[in-house]
Amino acid sequence: VQTCALPISEVFEALGKCGLDSEKSEVKRWYDGFIFGEYKDIYNPWSILNYLDSQQYTTYWANTSANSLVAKLVREGNRNIKSKFEKLLCGECIWSEIDEQIVYDQLNGNEQAVWSLLLASGYLKVLSYEKYKDIPEGTEPKYQLALTNLEVKLMFHRMIHDWFAIDRKSGRV
């Protein structure tokens, strides 16, 4: 965890050193939410370093990752994918099975693979999950998923807004 992410203690220490103690709750709202196994309250270093440098709240991480695949999967996804994605954008949670063995060729139209990719990529976080002992034999557990943080939510809002702007320019509906 320490090599690819920052724990809350290090983030708050850095905020203090920069005279930004009063921003802790807002930084947490914007950039917290990553979970690595039992490690919670984990932050993306890129977003935190950029925030400390600029002291502006914005979507730093979104501008660096390859979001084109995610955008394609959501935009071209079936009605159920779009409906669940809308719930996520409204701050609700969704339930889905997760496939830890995502295969690129299986992404199109495979709802479970889409949520698995979004989870593995850090766009979603697990809030809770069913334990094998609590579900019928032969079924897979479902996971309660939510958007990771405000930064991710705003990135997706902007992505969808841009789709409509492109469609208006091209005359498509």
Language model regions located:
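Short secondary-structure boundary/capping segments
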Residues: 1, 49-59, 66-67, 133-134, ...
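Short, small-residue-biased leader/transition segments that mark boundaries at the very start
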Residues: 2-6, 173
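Winged-helix-like regulatory helical subdomains adjacent to P-loop NTPase cores
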Residues: 5-115
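A structural signal for short, well-ordered beta-strand segments and their strand-loop junctions
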Residues: 42, 125-127, 173
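Extended, charge-enriched "interface" segments that sit outside catalytic cores
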Residues: 93-95, 103-105, 109-112, 129-153
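A short, conserved structural fragment
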Residues: 119-131
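Short, amphipathic alpha-helical interaction segments positioned at domain boundaries
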Residues: 141-172
